[in-house]
């Protein structure tokens, strides 16, 4: 009986071998055969949308393999001829096979896939069990119809038993044009060589790949081999369009992300530190901040064992060991290890000084310089020496001061071998060469050090930014203000070791010590 138009069976896309042909295939060829059969099955099953379980009854007659099944009121009879071979059961007879189909469509598919692998797996044992026997035909048919595609299992009359099989419905959701409508030819050479590898199996494999992505997304152009995957993919586009910021129009694929983004506009900071009361817009920022209180430093450098609160700090630190400087200046080609360093450097080329002092109007290119300068007006000195309790407005000044106690002088002049406690004073080397690169544009006076030029230039500008809070007197240098301030406080930090007399200024102490040394003053 001819199959109705549009009906497709698994046999239509299967390659069938006789027992003799099968025994002549090597293990690699049998593995390839199994893979192709499994791939055919996957592509047929992918056309299904909502499968349900169905019980079918199979029987056979002595005249041949004649299948009779009942599904509702539908009945169909198909005749098949012996002599060809599709799948081999190695371990046991077909009547012991039981397909445990679950109501879940996916589980049902996996069960059949597992069974097919069993049927085509251990071929060596088949050769032992069936050596000398007549050809046995285990055919797995898979029929598709616009209303009721069915799964069939064919067997010889000796091994027929009731089988549990799966029926796949709703194939009408897929157009006939998307179904597989041709059966590939089987080519076997006389010597059972590799002809079939180069013909039928590879032809089928190519056809499978051509059919794999027949369902295409209109939005992104991405294609899938079944409609269910396409619908799942389309939810991504739906999600992207669902969550939109009503302030700036930016879109997100998660409601949580858009809620977090809106805090940038509203300034909301719902996460509060219980230690200091500081608030944050994200829990991640709060978690990182808490490490400052707990002292936790989970990120450790493998080179020097130095630890950090934040991962970003560790990444920057590692560049010290690697020498990496990924940020390059387009003007002069100089490279930097941090982006902030490059930003500050660029201002040397542009002349930009975005930080302005409201007290004196002086501008700065770096925020750190502006912060230090502002302490001149406020008198703030947050850095304190643990040895003598002296305070400083700059951290670098405290560092230099500590070397007075430790007598450390790490900077050495290559010309004369003299050592210094500050890197700036190392420039004393210019005294050997007589070099004076810093020249005043007003009077052409030159200096070896830039700091001396800046002090000199205040004579022309009459700039005295440093003011005494006691008497209102102004000075051009911080050191001058410091010395003047001792007149009000009576502080005398310089003490003679011989007579314990103290002085406000170091120069006065040096003059006093000449009494003991006998050194005469220069006239």
Swiss-Prot record:
Gene3D superfamilies associated with the record: 6.10.140.140, Classic Zinc Finger
Localization terms from the record: Nucleus
Zinc finger (C2H2-type): 215-237, 243-265, 271-293, 299-321, 327-349, 355-377, 383-405, 411-432, 438-460, 466-488, 494-516
Keyword ATP-binding: no
GO terms for biological process, alphabetical: regulation of transcription by RNA polymerase II
Disulfide bond residue pairs: none
UniProt xrefs under SUPFAM superfamilies: beta-beta-alpha zinc fingers (SSF57667), KRAB domain (Kruppel-associated box) (SSF109640)
Domain spans labelled KRAB: 8-81
Cross-link (Glycyl lysine isopeptide (Lys-Gly) (interchain with G-Cter in SUMO2)): 205
GO molecular function: DNA-binding transcription factor activity, RNA polymerase II-specific; RNA polymerase II cis-regulatory region sequence-specific DNA binding; zinc ion binding
InterPro entries (alphabetical): KRAB (IPR001909), KRAB_dom_sf (IPR036051), Znf_C2H2-type (IPR050758), Znf_C2H2_sf (IPR036236), Znf_C2H2_type (IPR013087)
Entry annotated with the keyword Coiled coil: no
A Pfam family this chain is assigned to: zf-C2H2
An annotated GO cellular component: nucleus
Function text: May be involved in transcriptional regulation.
Name this protein carries in UniProt: Zinc finger protein 765
Organism: Homo sapiens
Gene responsible for this protein: ZNF765
């Amino acid at each position: 009986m001819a199959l109705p138009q549009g009906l497709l069976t698994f046999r239509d896309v299967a390659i069938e071998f006789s027992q003799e042909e099968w025994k002549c295939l090597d293990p690699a060829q049998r593995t390839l055969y199994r893979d192709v059969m499994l791939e055919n099955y996957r592509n047929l099953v992918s056309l299904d949308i909502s499968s349900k379980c169905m019980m079918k009854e199979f029987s056979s007659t002595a005249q041949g393999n004649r299948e009779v099944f009942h599904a509702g009121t539908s009945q169909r009879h198909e005749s098949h001829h012996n002599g060809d071979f599709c799948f081999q059961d190695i371990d046991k007879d077909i009547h012991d096979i039981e397909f445990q189909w679950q109501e879940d469509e996916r589980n049902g598919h996996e069960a059949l896939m597992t069974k097919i692998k069993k049927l085509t797996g251990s071929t060596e044992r088949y050769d032992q069990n069936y050596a000398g026997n007549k050809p046995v035909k285990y055919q797995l048919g898979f029929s598709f119809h616009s209303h009721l595609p069915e799964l069939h299992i064919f067997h010889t009359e000796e091994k027929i038993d009731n089988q549990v099989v799966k029926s796949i419905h709703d194939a009408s959701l897929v157009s006939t044009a998307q179904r597989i409508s041709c059966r590939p030819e089987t080519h076997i050479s006389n010597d059972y060589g590799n002809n079939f590898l180069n013909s039928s199996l590879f032809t089928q494999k190519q056809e499978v790949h051509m059919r794999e992505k027949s369902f295409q997304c209109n939005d992104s152009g991405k294609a899938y081999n079944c409609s269910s995957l396409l619908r799942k993919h389309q939810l991504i586009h739906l999600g992207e369009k669902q969550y939109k910021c009503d302030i700036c129009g930016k879109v997100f694929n998660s409601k949580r992300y858009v809620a977090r983004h809106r805090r940038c506009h509203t300034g909301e900071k719902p996460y509060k530190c219980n230690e200091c009361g500081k608030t944050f817009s994200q829990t991640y920022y709060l978690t990182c901040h808490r490490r400052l209180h707990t002292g936790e430093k989970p990120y450790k450098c493998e080179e020097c064992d130095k630890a950090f609160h934040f991962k970003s700090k560790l990444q920057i630190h590692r560049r010290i060991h690697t020498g990496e400087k990924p940020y390059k200046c387009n003007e002069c080609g100089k490279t930097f290890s941090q982006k902030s360093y490059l930003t500050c450097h660029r201002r040397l080329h542009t002349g930009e000084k975005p930080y302005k002092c409201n007290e004196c109007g002086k501008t700065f290119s770096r925020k750190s310089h502006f912060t230090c300068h502002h302490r001149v007006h406020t008198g703030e000195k947050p850095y304190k020496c643990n040895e003598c309790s002296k305070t400083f407005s700059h951290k670098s000044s405290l560092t230099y001061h500590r070397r007075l106690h430790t007598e450390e002088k790490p900077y050495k002049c290559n010309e004369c071998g003299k050592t210094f406690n500050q890197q700036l004073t190392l420039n004393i080397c210019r005294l050997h060469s007589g070099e004076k690169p810093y020249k005043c544009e007003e009077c052409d006076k030159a200096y070896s050090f830039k700091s001396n030029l800046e002090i000199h230039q205040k004579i022309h500008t009459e700039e005295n930014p440093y003011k005494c809070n006691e008497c209102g007197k102004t000075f051009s240098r911080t050191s001058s203000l410091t010395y003047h301030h001792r007149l009000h406080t009576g502080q005398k930090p310089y003490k003679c070791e011989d007579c314990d007399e103290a002085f406000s200024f170091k120069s006065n102490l040096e003059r006093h010590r000449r009494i003991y040394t006998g050194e005469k003053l220069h006239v």
